């Protein structure tokens, strides 16, 4: 379940604060004294709930022999002064003829269905979010629950968030049925800070702990040129730190935003990854919004990864996701505001496209013995309505 | 031992005198100065459903995961 982040809480609050004029604050300050003035500028009011919204999306991915597409829905509605509930539905129809599949097995098709339910409760300057997700495909079933709390402090300039998730999966294969389990714990901490009237930044840290069956029953490893069943550790501990900054660089009435994001990831399988993304968003007239972005990710291989192991080790994998590689992405997004429909629904049409190129440095195509690479196309078409 | 205590006392006095000139920091961007920050283009995540699709694609194909600032987990990724 994707819940609102801490940053959007104070965004809603900003909109509310903007309805109030500076002279109102000054008047309040005079009436209540200096302390009252600070309170009026600070945290004397409650956070607004997330706005009511409905989204319907068609998503598409095609790359490296895998094609996945399907519909997705999301709806969010206030049900009381302080409570908003949300639900989502996501379908992935996967046709898999990836290099792992075509070199060792037969291409296959399967469908993944995911449902989520969530509730957000606000009290003064705090928001509590609880959600549950269930994902079902023929050979993998995953359930998770998440709890997040965020709190505004320092006159609404800082938002602190804390959260945890617990996931429990059943892992199977088409040949054996469900044969093992996996558990996941995630703990996260974040701070969003207003820096200036035009710039804000956030820092997020997340620790993830997994145990159980973490491999893939269909994939094989290669040892001395012979294909063998891959052997994975049954535990993994990961850390990720993400820094983001976004600023309004528009002149005069023009609104244009520049954002930069960097994530450093490391884990006890000795994988280290750096991910960088830069985006630019601006309005074109009153109805159009355009965005362009580039993304770069590079990672170092897991300790037990080998394209063709030359020694027998306890763990061995030829999962290209654990190899040395990098990928670049370039994308664009357009949003058209269609205005109010039936005097109630504020409708927006959206299209987002991204091209990605993956280049592997030590993963070969065993049919050609050349280094493997592939390109991917990603598309999202969706309509959203706020009401 | 005695000289260490004297040094500590001097440092503590020095810090106290430095802090005596300081007031607690106040929020320096007032609510009425946050109009530009409130625009939708300044949100770190504008469209949750599209972002969820994107994150799923990255999670399945890259080792790095987490710290996206949203609740996560629950995907069948094998």
Protein language model regions, located:
Chain A
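Transmembrane beta-strands of outer-membrane beta-barrel pores
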Residues: 58-62, 91-95, 123-125, 134-138, ...
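Cleavable N-terminal export/targeting peptides
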Residues: 1-50, 387
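Residues that define the transmembrane beta-barrel architecture of outer-membrane proteins
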Residues: 67-71, 111-115, 122, 141-145, ...
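Short loop/turn motifs that connect adjacent beta-strands in outer-membrane beta-barrel proteins
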Residues: 45-51, 82, 154-158, 198, ...
């Amino acid at each position: 379940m994707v819940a609102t982040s801490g940053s959007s809480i104070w965004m809603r609050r900003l909109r509310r604060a903007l309805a109030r004029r500076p002279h109102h604050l000054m008047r309040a300050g005079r009436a209540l004294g200096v302390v009252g003035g600070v309170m009026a500028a600070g945290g004397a009011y409650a956070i607004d709930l997330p706005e009511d919204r409905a989204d319907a999306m068609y998503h598409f991915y095609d790359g490296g022999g895998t094609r996945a597409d399907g519909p997705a829905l999301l709806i969010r509605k206030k049900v009381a002064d302080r409570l908003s509930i949300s639900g989502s539905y996501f379908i992935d129809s996967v046709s898999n003829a990836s290099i792992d599949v075509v070199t060792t097995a037969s291409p296959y098709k399967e469908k993944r269905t995911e449902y989520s339910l969530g509730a957000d409760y606000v009290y003064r300057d705090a928001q509590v979010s609880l959600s549950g997700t269930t994902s079902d495909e023929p050979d993998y079933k995953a359930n998770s629950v998440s709890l997040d709390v965020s709190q505004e402090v320092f006159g609404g300039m800082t938002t602190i968030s804390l959260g945890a998730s617990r996931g429990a999966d059943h892992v199977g294969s088409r040949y054996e049925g469900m044969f093992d389990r996996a558990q996941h714990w995630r703990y996260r901490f974040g701070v969003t800070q207003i820096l200036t009237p035009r710039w804000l930044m956030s820092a997020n840290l997340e620790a993830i702990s997994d145990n159980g069956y973490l491999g893939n029953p269909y994939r094989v490893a290669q040892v001395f040129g012979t294909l063998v069943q891959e052997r994975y550790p049954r535990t993994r501990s990961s850390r990720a730190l993400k820094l983001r900054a976004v600023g309004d660089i528009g002149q005069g009435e023009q609104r244009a935003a520049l954002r930069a994001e960097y994530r450093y990831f490391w884990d006890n399988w000795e994988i280290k990854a750096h991910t960088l993304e830069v985006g630019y968003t601006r309005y074109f007239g009153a109805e159009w919004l355009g965005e362009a972005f580039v993304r770069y990710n590079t990672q170092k291989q897991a300790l037990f990864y080998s394209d063709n192991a030359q020694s027998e080790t306890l763990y061995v994998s030829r999962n290209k996701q654990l190899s040395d590689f990098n990928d670049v992405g370039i994308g664009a997004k357009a949003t058209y505001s269609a205005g109010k429909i039936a005097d109630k629904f504020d409708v927006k049409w959206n299209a987002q496209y991204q091209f990605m190129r993956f280049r592997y440095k030590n993963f070969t195509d065993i049919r050609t013995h050349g280094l493997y690479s592939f390109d991917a196309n990603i598309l999202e078409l969706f309509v959203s309505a706020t009401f | 031992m005695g000289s260490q205590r004297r040094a500590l006392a001097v440092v503590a006095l020095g810090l106290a005198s430095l802090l005596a000139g300081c007031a607690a920091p106040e929020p320096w961007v007032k609510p009425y100065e946050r109009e530009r920050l409130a625009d939708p283009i300044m949100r770190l995540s504008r469209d949750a459903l599209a972002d969820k699709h994107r994150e799923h694609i990255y999670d399945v194909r890259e080792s790095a995961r987490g710290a996206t600032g949203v609740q996560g987990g629950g995907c069948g990724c094998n």
